[in-house]
Amino acid sequence: THHRSSAASDVYKRQFHNVYSGNSYFKKLYNTQLSKVDQIVAISNYVKNEISKKYNLDSNKIKVINRGVDVKYFEKPILDSQIENIINKYQIDTSKNIILYPARLTNWKGQIEFLDIFNKMQNDNFLLYFAGDTKNQSYTEKLQNKIQSFNLGHKCKIIGNLPRDDLKTLYYLSSIITSFPLQAEGFGRTISEALIMKKKILAFNYGGVKDQLDKLDDIYKVDPHKYNEIVIKLQNIIKIDKEKFSNISLDSKDYISKTFSKYQMVQSYVDLYEQQSI
């Protein structure tokens, strides 16, 4: 995203949300334009490091302003009536441990690869719900067909895209929130959202998510693409009692609130523009 400061008309900013490979000609052209930019904003330390290497930029020219999470919204208690409504609306079985995989359904988000792992768990006490945008119909059908081929229809389902309130309630009802994308994400806010709600999580420890996992023990982190670690860690995380986890989750929640809040993000942008306009 490009921005031009109205307060300082000669100041140009460029905001990076993620890093993708591209055509070398366009990369060269883009790099030429970046050299003229006064200030570059990256939404995570991962993005900062990647664009610094990819475009051969001075890292001092890149400021990290973490993507913001609506802390107050996710802290707000959920009414019992909302919980009951979601259970009925999506036919949620609360008698089992729910693994929630919140991400739009597309190849690089890694749902099919995780389904392969879930199929090997052979544990009837776990359910798996995929929540996310289903506009990629071919991938959604591929995932649904694989669920059926594994005969997992009774343990796994695609819920699809959810309204914000519904997703928050599903976080609340879930035992573990997961994230295993095939590529590192620029930020990956579902992890911060889950941690604000003091939920157990398990995620690949790379990209923008890595900073969000900073205050958590290694049991909640998986090295990228180390699928053999996932089953063991899921089973161990479930065994952690509420009292032990409450201390871990409180520290992590405080860290997320102070570092990745929407308020902090907005204030950082305001400060940046004010500095440039002096």
Predicted regions and their residues:
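Short hydrophobic beta-strand element within catalytic cores of glycosyltransferases
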Residues: 200-203
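A charged, aromatic-enriched C-terminal amphipathic alpha-helix characteristic of glycosyltransferases
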Residues: 243-274
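Short alpha-helical donor nucleotide-sugar binding micro-motif in glycosyltransferases
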Residues: 161-162, 169-174, 189
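Glycosyltransferase donor-sugar binding loop
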Residues: 69, 102, 127-144, 160
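Single conserved hydrophobic/aromatic residue that forms the stacking wall/gate
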Residues: 1-8, 12
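Conserved acidic donor-binding segment of nucleotide-sugar-dependent glycosyltransferases
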Residues: 215-228, 236-242
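Conserved donor-binding/catalytic core segment of Leloir-type glycosyltransferases
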Residues: 41, 93-109, 115-118, 129
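Carbohydrate-associated surface elements
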Residues: 46, 68
